[in-house]
A protein has these predicted regions:
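Short, positively charged and aromatic/hydrophobic N-terminal segments
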Residues: 17, 26-32, 46
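Acidic, low-complexity/disordered tracts enriched in E/D and polar residues
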Residues: 38-120, 190, 445-541, 585, ...
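Long, charge-rich, low-complexity alpha-helical segments
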Residues: 116-166, 211-215, 223, 228-231, ...
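SAM-dependent Rossmann-like transferase core, predominantly class I methyltransferases
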Residues: 156-222, 227-239
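S-adenosylmethionine
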Residues: 195-204, 216, 248-417, 432
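Flexible, glycine-/basic-rich loop-and-beta segments that form/coincide
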Residues: 387, 394-477
Length: 618
């Protein structure tokens, strides 16, 4: 560390002497750059020059790199347009051949010099196409040495006359127009052999899913657990005053530091004081922030279930996906412990896996998928909403993750590890493995005291949904909170209306006087479908915001000849024989929670059943 500081001090004083003889304007600009350089150096300096990771120990160098990328028009839209739909979609599947074919077509065709250089650049960083000496000079110009010194590019190991990318460096765009550059390790489709154990994951389907489910309401303090290349932190900075990013990997924090400083201007980070908005900490799960409280926590934890090996060390594990614990314990640990770092009412969004156990009486059948997740929150320490998106058999799960790290390239190793996966799942009687989205909230004082019922929801939604769904989920939670504070009398006085994206479907036999099936469909968000009874169909049809719930219920009671409602008698009957009014009000609450119905005083369109402004795209 002393050597690093000395080098910084020496570099700064040398720069100042060189520019001390310049014009006054040059001197002012250089003093500002020196100040920024010193300040950037004091920001998590231990991650500025980590081996085999991008170097962020020279802010002036990062500025020149960013300016070169911008000059080359290296943007999300430009890359998509140059590649075309087919090649871009193939890249999303980690297939590089269509992209390489497209690039060669551009280089041979009548395209402009700028388009050809953009093609070379994207092929270099995204498709693992090396550059010749002449091409590198054309693409990088006088910043070639900056890219090399920042450990972004290197001489090709097989041919020193060529250059290869050391990292995957790509543009990433948010729907609000924000665009940044994100560096991560080269993926399995960009490099030979098995991934390195301390691989730093880039922008993938899981990270984008998490970004799309994360609530974007303004908060003071946010926490990103398992930051990786920093992608969640970058999105959090748009609505959090300060973000703490943690990871067990020193290399991951080095990538995050590099990306933060490379994009400091776009992310509204002052290079003279980065610590004002971001802090980086190394450690496992919540250990680095023990005793602290946050308004919002996001995490794409290393949740991949991996067979444990006796005597294995952390260096032998794929740290980007393997938390080192057996089964789904990494996710259960996170779910149980997250409330301890949340303020009352604070929320967390994360992704996870959970094991679904075989039924003891029918080994071919599973027990309920939510059995284990329910147990994790049974103590009431957190309100919870689990949405299972898919479930894989042990064999399919093993194949997915063996391929993910390119462990299928060595046949002997592949078969041996495949068997280990099957043995591991069999040892716990696992039928399948669920994957999905997790929303958590630390109960408020009122909820903890029992004044309102805690939100506990477990849904399986395996059909396509309209991402991003963050605002749809937020709207549902707000409606739940409002409903939870209402008894039936308050609900009867409320005005409801059908959400704008909801349509009704009626099905019946040809010639039949009445439909046999009536459905409501949400056209966005979670895209739910709800089967309606005659009563709920009638209620939905009359819910235009003008009539109170009680008025509609009274009209239905008369139309359907319900017996007179006696509150004392209803209480005596309990749940064994509910009055039609109670049944209907329960169904109405469910329609509101599922966002088919809205409170009529909600801001128009602000919280539709699926309305969601795109939080991220990539």
């Amino acid at each position: 560390m002393t050597v690093l500081v000395s080098r910084w001090v020496g570099a700064v004083s040398l720069r100042y002497r060189l520019y001390a003889v310049g014009a006054p304007g040059q001197m002012r600009r250089m003093r500002r750059m020196v100040c920024m350089t010193i300040s950037a150096a004091s920001f998590a300096p231990e991650y500025a020059a980590v081996a085999d990771a991008p170097r962020s120990d020279d802010y002036a160098r990062l500025t020149r790199i960013r300016e070169r990328l911008l000059a080359l028009n290296y943007s999300y839209d430009a890359v998509q347009e140059l590649l075309g739909v087919e090649a871009a979609e193939a890249m999303a599947r980690d297939q590089v051949v269509p992209g390489l074919w497209r690039v060669e077509h551009i280089l041979r065709g009548g395209y402009s010099a700028g388009e050809k250089n953009l093609a070379r650049l994207l092929a270099f960083f995204l498709l693992a196409r090396p550059l010749t000496e002449a091409e590198a000079a054309e693409v990088f110009g006088d910043t070639l040495v900056d890219f090399e010194n920042a450990a972004l590019i290197e001489r090709d190991a097989a041919d020193s006359a060529r250059w290869s990318a050391s990292v995957d460096l790509r543009p990433h765009a948010a729907d609000d127009g924000t665009e940044i550059f994100v560096a991560a390790d080269l993926g399995a489709h960009q490099r030979p052999g098995v991934l390195r154990k301390n691989h730093v994951l880039g922008i993938g389907h899981a990270s984008l899913t998490l970004a799309q489910i994360t609530e974007r309401t303004p908060v003071k303090r946010a926490l990103d657990v398992g930051t990786g290349c920093g992608i969640q932190t970058f999105h959090l900075l748009a609505h959090a005053e300060h973000v703490t990013a943690t990871d067990i990997s020193e290399r991951a924090l080095a990538f995050t530091r590099f990306n933060l400083l490379l994009n400091a201007q776009t992310l509204n980070i002052d290079p003279q004081n980065p610590q004002a908005r971001v802090s980086l900490r190394m450690g496992s799960l919540l250990e680095p922030v023990a005793g602290e409280l946050f308004d919002l926590v996001v995490s794409n934890p290393p949740f991949v279930i991996t067979p444990r090996v006796a005597g294995e060390s952390a260096e032998e594990q794929f740290t980007y996906r393997d938390g080192g614990l057996p089964g789904d314990e990494i996710v259960s640990t996170m779910v149980r412990q997250l409330p301890s770092v949340l303020v009352p009412g604070g929320r967390a969004q994360m992704l996870g896996n959970w094991e679904i156990i075989r039924d003891s009486e029918d080994l071919e059948a599973p027990r309920p998928w939510d059995e284990r997740p329910r147990a994790w929150v049974a103590d009431g320490g957190a309100e919870a909403w689990f949405i299972q998106r898919e479930a894989l058999t042990p064999a399919s799960y093993a194949e997915t993750w063996l391929k993910d790290a390119s462990e299928n390239r060595d046949r002997s190793h592949y078969e041996q590890t495949y068997v280990a996966y099957l043995n591991d799942f069999a040892s716990r009687n696992v039928h399948s493995i669920g994957f999905g989205m997790i929303w958590l909230r630390r109960p408020t004082e009122a909820t903890a005291a029992g004044a309102t019922d805690p939100l506990q929801r477990f849904e399986e939604i395996t059909y396509p949904i309209q991402q991003p769904i963050a605002r749809a989920l937020t709207g549902s939670v707000r409606r739940y909170d409002r409903l939870a504070a209402m008894d039936d009398e308050a609900l009867l006085a409320t005005h409801l209306e059908v959400a704008e994206d909801v349509t009704e479907e009626r099905h019946g036999r040809p010639g039949a006087e009445h439909p046999s099936v009536i459905l409501l469909r949400a056209g966005s968000g979670l895209c739910r479908t709800q089967l309606l009874s005659t009563e709920t169909a009638g209620f939905a049809s009359a819910s235009d915001g003008e009539l109170a719930v009680g008025q509609i219920v009274a009209a239905l009671a008369m139309l359907l000849s319900w017996p007179e409602y006696d509150e004392a008698a209803a209480a005596a009957r309990g749940t064994q024989e509910q009055h039609p009014r109670d049944t209907l009000l329960h169904a109405v609450r469910e329609l509101v929670l599922k966002s088919f119905l809205h409170f009529s005083d909600e801001h128009a369109g602000a919280e539709s059943a699926g309305e969601s402004t795109a939080e991220a795209q990539g």
